[in-house]
Amino acid sequence: VKLLVTQSKSTLANRAFDYSGRVLLPLWGKYYPDGPRPQNALKAAREWLSGRIKLPEAKGRILQCHAAAREAENNHVARSAARAIGQSASTVHSARHCIGLALYGALAVACNALGVDAPRERLERRAAEECERMLDALREVSIENEPNPAKIDWKC
């Protein structure tokens, strides 16, 4: 969390988009190969961040990703992947959504690797390993002494 608050919203968003596209979209696609909503949400978020579309259009596609997650209620991996992607895409309008990538994304990866019925301790350990990978990815793109850090209110 300490590194998150030192980075700009665009750095946080781009890192979340990249990770989601590389790691989580394939997990979603494994179960829903014809389900475009998570990919559409990431595309819309990138377009909004670059100024090509307005927030309401991006928000509509992001909300569709969240709907896809709800519809995948019986598939823990796909549901968690779609939730993480939706949170990643939502980082464009509120930087604090970037934490959803770690929460849902690590769970998706752990459940995919070990199965949803794996012992909780093993799932937690695998999720922690994935969170460390996410942190390493952020470290790679982080800007030391970022002049415009995101103003994140964690609401807790």
Describe the role of every protein-language-model region.
Residues C111-C156:
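C-terminal binding/interaction regions
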Residues V1-E124:
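Structured binding/interaction patches within domain cores
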